[in-house]
Amino acid sequence: MDTKSFGRRVAAASVGILAVGAIEIASPTAHAALSYGSIAYADNGAGAVVWNYPSSREAQKAAIQYCGWSSCEALNYFTDCGVAVRNDTHVQSAHGPTLGAATRAALNAIPGGNGYIDLWACN
């Protein structure tokens, strides 16, 4: 099982635009259809992403645990690539066959349509 955990970050929207452009050049692709990942966030902006778990339930439970706060909730689970994008007021998660596809889906759904990648993983 693999994990990334981060606290609250601040970044300019232009960084998110540059990051999406870089993703188009070398976008990680999911390879493990039988592995699950999940992304969790807390009210204070803390978050965690896990991947390589044998079930969606175990992945979500681990993401919440690694998030580390009582307000942590799993935003999603995925067998491909999962991403959470942020802007000043929102966090939006999505998944897709590549990091680029997942990022586009999250940016299309986040209010305002812009943000930056905060957490991501591909199985």
Predicted features, each with a name:
Residues 2-123:
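Helix-coil modules at protein/domain termini and other flexible surface or pore-lining loops
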